[in-house]
Amino acid sequence: MTNLSDQTQQIVPFIRSLLMPTTGPASIPDDTLEKHTLRSETSTYNLTVGDTGSGLIVFFPGFPGSIVGAHYTLQGNGNYKFDQMLLTAQNLPASYNYCRLVSRSLTVRSSTLPGGVYALNGTINAVTFQGSLSELTDVSYNGLMSATANINDKIGNVLVGEGVTVLSLPTSYDLGYVRLGDPIPAIGLDPKMVATCDSSDRPRVYTITAADDYQFSSQYQPGGVTITLFSANIDAITSLSVGGELVFRTSVHGLVLGATIYLIGFDGTTVITRAVAANNGLTTGTDNLMPFNLVIPTNEITQPITSIKLEIVTSKSGGQAGDQMSWSARGSLAVTIHGGNYPGALRPVTLVAYERVATGSVVTVAGVSNFELIPNPELAKNLVTEYGRFDPGAMNYTKLILSERDRLGIKTVWPTREYTDFREYFMEVADLNSPLKIAGAFGFKDIIRAIRRIAVPVVSTLFPPAAPLAHAIGEGVDYLLGDEAQAASGTARAASGKARAASGRIRQLTLAADKGYEVVANLFQVPQNPVVDGILASPGVLRGAHNLDCVLREGATLFPVVITTVEDAMTPKALNSKMFAVIEGVREDLQPPSQRGSFIRTLSGHRVYGYAPDGVLPLETGRDYTVVPIDDVWDDSIMLSKDPIPPIVGNSGNLAIAYMDVFRPKVPIHVAMTGALNACGEIEKVSFRSTKLATAHRLGLRLAGPGAFDVNTGPNWATFIKRFPHNPRDWDRLPYLNLPYLPPNAGRQYHLAMAASEFKETPELESAVRAMEAAANVDPLFQSALSVFMWLEENGIVTDMANFALSDPNAHRMRNFLANAPQAGSKSQRAKYGTAGYGVEARGPTPEEAQREKDTRISKKMETMGIYFATPEWVALNGHRGPSPGQVKYWQNKREIPDPNEDYLDYVHAEKSRLASEEQILRAATSIYGAPGQAEPPQAFIDEVAKVYEINHGRGPNQEQMKDLLLTAMEMKHRNPRRALPKPKPKPNAPTQRPPGRLGRWIRTVSDEDLE
């Protein structure tokens, strides 16, 4: 949608940059077409906390320039004192003439402690005020929260260690470029002369009626009598000018006036002083004119200006004590703030106040500002600029999303941890083809679907060549989500009359419920077609419904990759894993934009696209290859992924590339391969096998390579890869439940693999992991230390324990706690927990809890069968029983939830019984019990299959019955007397330790001995 020449584009870069500025700048897709360059500018400040431990940071989140904000510290007298301005790292006016702000985010938090302080304390309040800074009436720590009633624009009592993030959201669109106040060529007699070109469009003008026949009267005093003629609130952080005039009349001879204008900052101090008149003598009986014509350049405004004041000093030539002085005045002034009314320049403002932070601590402000910039003539000689791309669909989509930001949970101020967690949701919003899985969890899915339906057709309206793409996307939405999307947009939900069940796309929807797939329920059908009651659709499949080239029928080999994403200096790393496919040729059109243009050369000089250009791949290949991320694999097709995956590093994909180069399969090989090859062609072990194992098993694939469950690797890769079969996965097989090739104890191993946390593999990190493993094997104390670390990470208290260690450097408190802690098996422990052991209550569930668990189990079982009305509450009302056949038939025919305890016998029809032949039963039993060529199944198993056919009136087993038969077959195989006896396992010398629920990121989750 955002690139009319590239129909594979899914991301709207502008809204992605708005919601996640750390992803970089993007051109604003409006109709302001000027050649520009994109630039991302950082801002980093370490602010020292004052004596009171409190302070205030004022941000101008929408200001189109280098100014970011200002910092104030709270003094002992209750007033704020200006500390410093916050700017971007580069002074933009020095190199650029014009600017447009694209996006901006700033993070405020503290992670340092001054000397003598052992705990990080203090809290933060933050609020976004839709007015200007001078309009705030209460800037105290608690008073800030009353500045707005919008809950999405304020947060309170956030720990200073967690921090807050300020997100700039636009208040207007289709804006022009702003002149930055850049210096212009000029020559003057004064070497300090400076000439700049400031922004003159959209000025903010304050008109002040200074006096309307104001009467002044006083007695003479030495030095004159000073009065404040007026004081008014204004807002300025850029250049300003003051114009106007005052007219004075007097009847006293020898009066002398002086006038001074003061520009006052937010903290009440005078920033700029200008003498307008000095020793002006007044003539009696006439109008005495005092003109005002001031220009204040930007470089003299060193802090935000919030008010202006005019003082008049009255004196008398040759005056004596007691002489009368009087005059009257009238007139007006106009204060013009250049560019002050540009949206975002002076309003809104975001205020972040911190309190009770240790004196001397450092509060860090870090963030990024993204701009569209037009360089000055000198820089333009060496900097390439280009036009922005006009995309009405992307612009309309962005406007519609942000117009509903309150309903969609898009805030301007966030706790930093919450903002980091929301990044995946923001990526869903920016991706037009995303299935909105996270948005559905928050209840935002219908809103975004309706917005997509409105925004996407704009492309086909304005650009006819893009109509097929918009039509295909719209049809995909109507096909899978039409009823719910229409309901969200105001259209009544009703049967659409489309025979959706007859479509071949239903075949792409798997019943893999354990992957947490979302439910696309109640797809209405016409009477002559089968009814599809709630298909469980995977995110990849939903993405495929909108994407035109998501399914690729081509030979490929697969390998898993462990990757990390690094956001910025203030954001931690986040782990992710992905399956990749190796396909032949240069196919960058199938890659996501984040991977295109990156490749690595092999030893033979060929290229492998999708790898980071880091050295040479230690392989000799006969052709070029491309690696692409995938979401799923079915039979002879792979489903491509358009997730923003970075280029690959490391050597764990060498085995898959080598297999592809030698055998050149015509269909995807349904085995995930992992393994690095050395110069001798031998397979070397790779790290992070547990995470790769989880990635493979999410797709129902085996993991082949060093350390896999069931593949014995030889020393030479050519011998190893010949063992790979072509074993397509059945359509109705669950991804990783009861897989026949898993050993009986694989469930625990897989659980550990799923819970593991790893990092991107690099040679340095692999060496460090091996060194830690070797040290743990020879040093029991080090092994115990690693166990403690794993326990801390498993329970999420690593940071808490680190802070506790700072407050207890000699471990006195910890020793006392451990000495007094109840031991396992002690009297107090048995009295509290029974005999179940330390920390586990020895009691069963109450009858009510057991009944609720039973209702939940029945409901989940019904859900796997497509019966979604049987919620736990409905099952409880139905006498804690599942739905009867009559209730199910009533729901299928009427589309209404049946009443509990009503059998609906009128809807039950007796089924015709038909008998299955012995040959049919034997063939089915042989197919289920083992592969062709093996011994025939025992008679007991044939009898079990015959019972199933009898129960089903001559039909074959359903999913649940097939699962039970597979389990029965596995049990009978283990009891087969002809089966070789397993080798006896040696008894351990030491008692086995309780395995942790989740291992640490530095320890391999599955050892080689466990995998044999």
Swiss-Prot record:
GO terms for cellular component: host cell cytoplasm; T=13 icosahedral viral capsid. Residues 513-755 form the Peptidase S50 domain. The active site is at 652 (nucleophile), 692. The record marks 441-442, 487-488, 494-495, 501-502, 512-513, 755-756 as: Cleavage. Keywords: Capsid protein, Host cytoplasm, Hydrolase, Metal-binding, Protease, Serine protease, T=13 icosahedral capsid protein, Virion. Specific enzymatic cleavages yield mature proteins. The capsid assembly seems to be regulated by polyprotein processing. The protease VP4 cleaves itself off the polyprotein, thus releasing pre-VP2 and VP3 within the infected cell. During capsid assembly, the C-terminus of pre-VP2 is further processed by VP4, giving rise to VP2, the external capsid protein and three small peptides that all stay closely associated with the capsid. A divalent metal cation binds at residue 30. Residues 1003-1012 are annotated as: Interaction with VP1 protein. One of its GO terms (molecular function) is structural molecule activity. The keyword Iron does not apply. Residues 970-1012 are annotated as: Disordered. The keyword Nucleotidyltransferase does not apply. One of its GO terms (biological process) is proteolysis. Its EC number is 3.4.21.-. Residues 975-986 have a biased composition (Basic residues). Capsid protein VP2 self assembles to form an icosahedral capsid with a T=13 symmetry, about 70 nm in diameter, and consisting of 260 VP2 trimers. The capsid encapsulates the genomic dsRNA. VP2 is also involved in attachment and entry into the host cell by interacting with host ITGA4/ITGB1. This is Structural polyprotein. The lineage of its organism: Viruses, Riboviria, Orthornavirae, Birnaviridae, Avibirnavirus.
